[in-house]
Amino acid sequence: MRDLTEYVCKAMDMLDSIGIKYGNIIDCTVNTRAQKRWGQCRKVPGGYTININAVLLDEQNSEDGLMNTILHELAHSVDGCMNHGANWKAVASRIYSAYGYEIKRTDSAEDKGVIESTRQIEYKYQFRCEKCGKVIGRTRASKFTRNPKWFTHRGCGGHFQKI
């Protein structure tokens, strides 16, 4: 497993070299539980904490995906950038211009260079389209999980059945 602290320091040096003033990073942690997000930046008294999905630290996965995520979260610590608004986009654009990391609001596992076998999501609910057979999963209860017949599959127009 890669050393998160080493990569965070490298990302901070990159931002320092292009004059981006990020906030006081109090702590960086590895999140072993998150299944749907790559990272998170939280404002806490005295600064910010950043946590990064453990999957990104796996040696099998792309180093670029890890750096991209760390830079994304550090960008949130810049004044006025906690959301994905114009200020955050301007910071992301500066990072892209300097280093080529395309920092976006969302990324797929493929975009991050994550091998799917290293990222297993445990679905509490699974459904199959009656028309095309596609299986989809959901981790939380919702209108869809309670009444799948009310919804149609965008791909083929079929209805879902719980499996």
Enumerate the predicted regions with their spans.
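Walker B catalytic acidic pair
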Residues: 73
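Active-site-proximal or metal-binding-adjacent scaffold patches in catalytic folds
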Residues: 1-68, 77-163
